[in-house]
Amino acid sequence: MAKSTVNKLSVSVRTNTGKGASRRARRDGKVPAVLYGHGEEPQHLELPAHAFSAVLRHVGTNAVLTLEVAGKEQLALTKAIDVHPIRHTIMHADLLVVRSGEKIVVEVPVEVEGDAGPDILVTQETTSIEIEAEALSIPEQLTMSIEGAEPGTQFTARQIPLPVGVTLVSDPEMLVVNVVNAPTDAQTKAKYAGEAHEAPEVGTAENKTAATESE
């Protein structure tokens, strides 16, 4: 993960809150946010939308930020973001106060790499796991290799290589990747033929009764 000093944002304190104030902030290119944690009073902030989005694109959703607030610096973890369903712009952010050297629990994506071989079907059952790591050493993602895996192989969370200082929080036996023989053409055709045979007739019993009575 990139160092927090790279993720430095100059932010302002929000004096007005509520939906109207949030809409105005977004029109001005700001993201309304709340900073909380460590027993401190929640602080309502406005983040520069373009710079904040750039950090999330390059570092990931577990980005640790260095916030410059009223002349002071504060480390914060991006805990949650609300994204507009159509425009895909960030509507709001929840930020968690963190301390240098502090260990925190976060969810990190898992990427599968490698080739299990021909005629093999690989299914990723879990796309992320929970880990504990120092706030400034959170990995952007974790990688699991399935190179040469044979049918019947199952990879669990405990088999994911973790960086030094990172510990697994998720269930070690949680299934991450399942490797099986790919179905043959004959099996696929038989499956679809069976599904077509089992498909119910169009129309409900009530409709058929009504049609019969109308005759």
UniProtKB/Swiss-Prot annotation:
Keyword list, A-Z: Ribonucleoprotein, Ribosomal protein, RNA-binding, rRNA-binding
GO CC list: cytosolic large ribosomal subunit
Superkingdom of this protein's organism: Bacteria
Region (Disordered) location: 1-29, 190-215
Bias type Polar residues, positions: 1-19, 206-215
A Gene Ontology molecular function term of the record: structural constituent of ribosome
Pfam families cross-referenced by the UniProt entry: Ribosomal_L25p, Ribosomal_TL5_C
GO-annotated biological processes: translation
Complex and partners: Part of the 50S ribosomal subunit; part of the 5S rRNA/L5/L18/L25 subcomplex. Contacts the 5S rRNA. Binds to the 5S rRNA independently of L5 and L18.
Function, as annotated: This is one of the proteins that binds to the 5S RNA in the ribosome where it forms part of the central protuberance.
Family stated for the protein in its record: Belongs to the bacterial ribosomal protein bL25 family. CTC subfamily.
Protein name according to UniProt: Large ribosomal subunit protein bL25
Gene: rplY
